[in-house]
Amino acid sequence: MKVILIKDTKDGKANTIIDVSPGYATNFLFKNKLAEPLNSRTEKLLVKRKQQIEIEKQEKQEQIAKLKIEIERLVLWFKLKGNKESVHGAITAKKIKKELEIKGIFVDKQAIQTSGISTFGTSFVDIKLSSQTIAKLKINITKDE
């Protein structure tokens, strides 16, 4: 019996067609609302669902690309106390996130890949926006008098 999976299961991912025994389909998949039987109506719905998922995926990629451009144009300025050779403190992911939010950019703290910047001058921080997209944020640290 051919069925369309509604949710991810051990048999496959959501929105895929699989072939299972009628007993398994009736007693487990349909009962737990994990799948629906394959017929012309559900097949048309599956095609529409896949198209909608593809459109949403492309829109998300476009948003990520715009966000990457916006982040890479930005320069954040921080002040740290210290003398000529040593710095007192560090710029952490939490501080970077807070400054980005002030500028209207919202990213997850775990996306900011830094272990703390503790040197004066210009540094670059990677911000992981998706599995394939990483933006480089420019950070300038000056001495606080």
UniProtKB/Swiss-Prot annotation:
NCBIfam families: L9 (TIGR00158). PANTHER family: 50S RIBOSOMAL PROTEIN L9. Signal peptide: none annotated. SUPFAM superfamilies: L9 N-domain-like (SSF55658), Ribosomal protein L9 C-domain (SSF55653). One of its GO terms (molecular function) is rRNA binding. The gene is rplI. Keywords: Ribonucleoprotein, Ribosomal protein, RNA-binding, rRNA-binding. This is Large ribosomal subunit protein bL9. InterPro entries: Ribosomal_bL9, Ribosomal_bL9/RNase_H1_N, Ribosomal_bL9_bac/chp, Ribosomal_bL9_C, Ribosomal_bL9_C_sf, Ribosomal_bL9_N, Ribosomal_bL9_N_sf. It comes from the Bacteria. The keyword Membrane does not apply. Belongs to the bacterial ribosomal protein bL9 family. Binds to the 23S rRNA. GO terms for biological process: translation. GO terms for cellular component: ribonucleoprotein complex; ribosome.
